[in-house]
Amino acid sequence: MLRPTLIFPEGAALARGREVVASTDATALTVENLRAAYRRGIFPWPGGVTAPIPWCCPRVRAVLVFDELTPGRTLEKAARKSGWSYSIDRAFPAVIAACAAASRPEQEGTWISPAVLEAYTALHRAGQAHSVEVWQGEDLVGGLYGVDAGGFFGGESMFHRVDNASKLAIWFLATYLRERGQAWMDIQQLTPHLARLGAREVTRAVFLAGLAKELGAGRELFPPRQDPTQ
């Protein structure tokens, strides 16, 4: 199967251009295209299993600045009393599958089609997609996954099976990233769930300038994968 290599706009052309910079089918969801897209602040935004996939750089972008994170007393209490444990990349396939299966009132169905699941699993094997897991004993009760664009991590999707589990996954991740020098993360779209944690929207120009600065820091956020086949 021929898999196209996409050429994405960047710099001023991207900052002043349209929100949808390309439209493809699922064959374009390659590790190489995903790497190139995320480094430019672009992400695929599938609308369904068979629909064309738009590659987007929205004019308004949601971000979570870690110094503005407001967990609130309820979440702080849950963190103290839950007895849950947290991990990174322990169960990426289970996390992305749970995100795909999660029911979301604001959308019909899921954008995480089998092709998307396969593409981001390949990106995980390549060391650039990562997961956070929340465990209640041996049970996976929440988590999220996202993409490391090369020293800057952005979230893609999250899920919870127990109240507060996805929020605590974000809180754990924010602490982890802040300890490694990252000050904020891309969350793409603002939802009420994330707004309650302190997330907000910025313009595309502000986002792209911040992304360039973060990528220029040359950080290594995650250790190399020990087994790239998993």
Region locations from a protein language model:
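N-acyltransferase acceptor-side catalytic subdomain
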Residues: M1-Q230
